[in-house]
From Swiss-Prot:
UniProt cross-references to Gene3D superfamilies, sorted A to Z: 1.10.520.10, Peroxidase, domain 2
InterPro entries named in the record: Catalase_peroxidase, Haem_peroxidase, Haem_peroxidase_sf, Peroxidases_AS
Entry's Gene Ontology BP terms: cellular response to hydrogen peroxide; hydrogen peroxide catabolic process
Cofactor note: Binds 1 heme b (iron(II)-protoporphyrin IX) group per dimer.
Protein name listed in UniProt: Catalase-peroxidase
Gene responsible for this protein: katG
Cross-link Tryptophyl-tyrosyl-methioninium (Tyr-Met) (with W-98) per UniProt, renumbered positions: Y226-M252
Amino acid sequence: MDGNNSNSQGKCPVMHGGNTASEGDVMAWWPRALNLEILHQKDTKPNPMGDGPSYHEALKSLDFDALKTDMHALLTDSQDWWPADYGHYGGLMIRLAWHSAGSYRLADGRGGGGSGNIRFAPLNSWPDNGNLDKARRLLWPLKKKYGNKISWADLILLAGTIAYENMGLKTFGFGFGREDIWGPEIDTYWGAEKEWLAPSDTRYEDVAKPDTMENPLAAVQMGLIYVNPEGVNGKPDPLKTAAQVRTTFARMAMNDEETAALTAGGHTVGKTHGNGDAGALGPEPEGAELENQGFGWVNPNLGGKASNAVTSGLEGAWTTNPTQFDMGYFELLFGYEWELKKSPAGAQQWQPINIKPEHMPVDASDPSQRRMPIMTDADMAMKMDPAYRAICEKFMADPAYFKDTFARAWFKLTHRDMGPKDCYFGPDVPSEELVWQDPVPAGPTGYDVARVKSAIAASGLSIAEMVATAWDSARTFRGSDKRGGANGARIRLAPQKDWDGNEPDRLAKVLGVLEPIARDAGASLADVIVLAGNVGIEQAARAAGHDVAVPFSPGRGDATDAMTDAESFDVLEPLADGYRNWQKADYVVSAEEMLLDRTQLLGLTAPEMTVLVGGMRVLGTNYGGTKHGVFTDREGALTTDFFVNLTDMAYSWVPVDRRTYEIRDRKTGKARWTATRADLVFGSNSILRAYAEVYAQDDNAGKFVADFVAAWTKVMNADRFDLA
């Protein structure tokens, strides 16, 4: 019960001290505090499967054919509690899959359908995801039947793919392997708005300039997947909408042709729902009453008829045959002139002028009745925008090309955040390598690793050069969409070789030394770069009195320029790296927040972040050789000096400017060291200080080295999906 409840209801007779409501979060008192919880959201404790067999192991026993057969049957098995449009759930399942995958954004790789996140807040309650809770409940019998052998994430995206197959499309393929999460993804920033569908102005510097949308966002309003179907801020104007569509889809890594194909193919089947009063709907799933059992948007006027459903507020199908994948979208869009009308729910939509009765789709519940088709403002953009129109005309002239382009774009949409093909499972994985999958060839494994390490050690490279280069190669990894990382040695290719954060001159020098070593040994450069980092760490550990061997698994390959979509790699360029105490520019976001974001994308925990930063500082790996945070007189030795001096009360910390500090002797006032916010946060934040104190203890020097090596190896192997 609410301890602040002062109304007539009785108070709980037992003192209720559990912080069970979200508004009781203890950190709500300090909203600017670092949210370290984003580093631990995938803790195994909330996972009911515990340490049992992995999902990928369970997949091996899945009867794929039986599941697909059952899925086909489900699509036409209409249920009274949520009747199917036209007796077919295909449109609903496609929308579920689309909206699950469509939250992906290229900038940080977050969102997307790879984790089943649409089951949880906020996505399960976004206005744009209205009534998709019904689609998930329709899939429950299949999830119940096949159990641990199929994740929700896979099942949802498979449902959309099978729906297209059932309605006549030859799909490009399907990869299983998405693992479910068990709670909301609290690391993802969806926007600053505090209300659903707040005007776009909040997230744009200038709504008239779509490229001014706040990064990393990829949707025009809070609670939408892409654009407002009624137009910019709900005001129809196809050309303005076209500009927003272009930017929105580009932020999902889609070009104009893929965007036009997805728009047309997505609206070839299914319908919109707005035949009623949207104000009569119940609250979204997260706000619904207990007895609704997770059902949101309850419609008191449904009456068992699909044609009475209300979702987006728009009402009608796009094509004459909404359960067939055909060319009907283009035939209607380009075959008629269109005018603005309002749906029964009051939404702005486009309707054809003087349409022939035989071109009108039948009613979703009563096939004896015909209804007016509709187009959204985004559909009209395909006709009015010159570039989109030219693409659509190309599709109309070559239906086979359109269907293949759409099938490939759908595959990309539903697999974009899965990572390389090593992460795909099942009988329908396409054999074709696609450049957006960031392919990497298999690397050699039979070479003499010890010989390579000896050659590196004798090369004259410094510890800092070796460790920094290996780190820079691996730090691009993003667990969000499984891109980046050391495998492929793309650090030697454009654009990475020219990134400021990679110190191109230093990088070229190091690669010039390592490349002949790799060549002579028959090893990949990717492996040798990582080995060089390991050699540097082993040398530094010995200098501190610890004899360690850093684990290493050969087999990384070297990607080529032809395997690399250079433009799509631009988003992986680090703007800051707290591990190397570097920022490309002065940002509004603090250095410690950017460090936290990098850490989360790398899949590291707060203790791992702590030990890595402390170790990297004493190894002298700072960008440009700066001395910020190098709290040691033994640079190059893997000691705990960073933590010892950070926690020593003999020193005070004095700001020099907004970003840097001096560490001064309290008695003499003499400056001893300098630091950045990315250093001092480990003494300021109470949680991080607790970790720092562990490593500052006299008895934990050995633990520090062991923990550093383990965290380092985790980063170096983050993209080694072939080892799983």
